[in-house]
């Protein structure tokens, strides 16, 4: 799906906007799915790629956030193996606090989703662990400050 912001008043752009306006053509109440799940690598690059998706959803369907329908699928950073049993850890700190209780285990650092075996990826898809994206109470003011027309508000915020 592609999100395009069009501010031009040309005839071609108006036609494009009418034909491709995602917001007008899709209502959150008529979506075929209960939730939107975003899955990326658990490293900084993967987490950084989430923001454009969030912005697209937020600027078109803020009600999905209010309803708790935007979620991150947590992906493991470390998989500890004891025999055939696996334990997944979603942060290094989580692993560090549990490692002493795991006897004779091996670990595997997951560099990205491509590091998962097919069975692990299937498990993650079939039994996802979610983080629900929650908005602060003043989200409308924050969004207006960060994305609105008043650059002075952003400059003031960034200088704090």
Curated annotation (Swiss-Prot):
Physiological role: Small subunit of the DNA topoisomerase that untwists superhelical DNA. Controls topological states of double-stranded DNA by transient breakage and subsequent rejoining of DNA strands.
GO cellular component: DNA topoisomerase type II (double strand cut, ATP-hydrolyzing) complex; protein-containing complex
Enzyme class: isomerase
Protein name as it appears in the record: DNA topoisomerase small subunit
PANTHER family: DNA TOPOISOMERASE 2, DNA TOPOISOMERASE/GYRASE
Example GO molecular function: DNA binding
Entry-linked InterPro entries: DNA_Topoisomerase_II (IPR050634), Topo_IIA-like_dom_sf (IPR013760), Topo_IIA_B_C (IPR013759), TOPRIM_C (IPR031660)
Top-rank taxon, per record: Viruses
SUPFAM superfamilies for this protein: Type II DNA topoisomerase
The gene coding this protein: 60
Xref: Gene3D superfamilies: 3.40.50.670
Keywords: ATP-binding, DNA-binding, Isomerase, Nucleotide-binding, Topoisomerase
Cofactor dependency: Mg(2+)
Swiss-Prot/TrEMBL catalytic activity: ATP-dependent breakage, passage and rejoining of double-stranded DNA
Additional note from the record: There is a 50-nucleotide untranslated region in the coding sequence of gene 60. The ribosome apparently skips this region while reading the mRNA.
Pfam families noted in UniProt: TOPRIM_C
Source species of the chain: Enterobacteria phage T4 (Bacteriophage T4)
Quaternary structure annotation from Swiss-Prot or TrEMBL: Part of the DNA topoisomerase complex made of gp39, gp52 and gp60.
Ranges annotated as spanning the membrane: none
EC number(s) on file: 5.6.2.2
């Amino acid at each position: 799906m592609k999100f395009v912001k069009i501010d031009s008043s040309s005839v071609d752009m108006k036609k494009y906007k009418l034909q491709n306006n995602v917001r007008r053509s899709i209502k959150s109440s008529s979506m075929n799915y209960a939730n939107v799940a975003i899955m990326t690598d658990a490293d900084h690059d993967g987490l950084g790629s989430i923001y454009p998706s969030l912005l697209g959803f937020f600027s078109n369907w803020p009600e999905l956030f209010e309803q708790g329908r935007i979620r991150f699928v947590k992906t493991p950073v470390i998989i500890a193996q004891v025999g055939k049993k696996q334990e997944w850890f979603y942060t290094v700190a989580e692993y560090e606090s549990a490692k002493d209780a795991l006897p004779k285990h091996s670990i595997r650092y997951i560099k990205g989703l491509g590091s998962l075996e097919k069975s692990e990826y299937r498990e993650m898809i079939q039994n996802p662990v979610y983080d629900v994206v929650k908005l602060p109470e003043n989200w409308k003011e924050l969004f207006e400050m960060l994305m609105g027309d008043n650059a002075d508000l952003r400059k003031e915020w960034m200088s704090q």
